[in-house]
Amino acid sequence: MDKMELKALGKINLGLDVLGRRENGYHDVRMVMQTVYLYDQIRMEKTKKPGIELLTNLFYLPVNENNLAYQAADLLMKEFHVKEGVKITLDKHIPVAAGMAGGSSNAAAVLFGINRMFSLGLSQKELMERGVTLGADVPYCVMRGTVLAEGIGEILTPLPACPKCHVLIAKPPISVSTKLVYEKL
C-alpha cells in the first residue's frame, strides 16, 4: 500500500484518580477514558527517499523528532530496517494541550499506518507495547473505545460501550501541558 488516510480520534477522561507518584516521575492512575469522534486527519505516502517527512497545518507544531507522530514512524522504521521513506501530512483538529490525547492519537495512527504500509505484521498488542515507549496514552489510542486504564495508563481493561450521546467540549483560549500538570502533583 503506497498511500493511506487515517483518523486519529481524540479522547476524554470520564473519571481520573491520581493514586501516587513513581520514582521515575510517572504517576499511578485509575481512569475511565472514552474515544470521541473529534479527530486529526493523517495522510501517509510511501516515498523512495529514505527518512520521514512530516507536514502539519499548524505552523507552531514541531515537524521533527519532537513530534510524537514522527517518533512513532521513526520507532518502527528503525526497528524493522525500513529502507523506503514516508511522508506524513497531519491536519490537526483536536485541540492542542487540551488533555484529549491529540499527540498520542497521532502516534497511534502512525504506528498503525507504518505497520500496514510496510506490511510489518504487528498485532494490536504489539503496537500497544511499542506505543507505551512513546507515551502513556498511546496504547489506549491504539485500542480505543471505553476503557479502564490503570498503572501509568498502560494497563487497559475494555468496559461496556457508553451509550451514544452528544458531548460539548469547550476549550478555553489557554493551553495546559499534561506533562506539566502531572509534574506539579
Set out the residue ranges of the language-model regions.
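Short pre-catalytic strand/loop immediately N-terminal to key active-site residues, enriched for Gly-Thr
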Residues: 30, 86-99
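N-terminal beta-alpha supersecondary unit
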Residues: 2-83
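DPxDG-like acidic metal-binding loop motif
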Residues: 69, 98-126
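Solvent-exposed beta-strand sheet faces enriched in polar/charged residues
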Residues: 15, 45, 55-57, 87-91, ...
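Structural signature of cysteine-dependent C-C bond-forming condensing enzymes
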Residues: 80-86, 154-158
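ATP-dependent small-molecule kinase catalytic core of the GHMP/sugar-kinase superfamily
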Residues: 2-7, 11, 15-31, 120-185
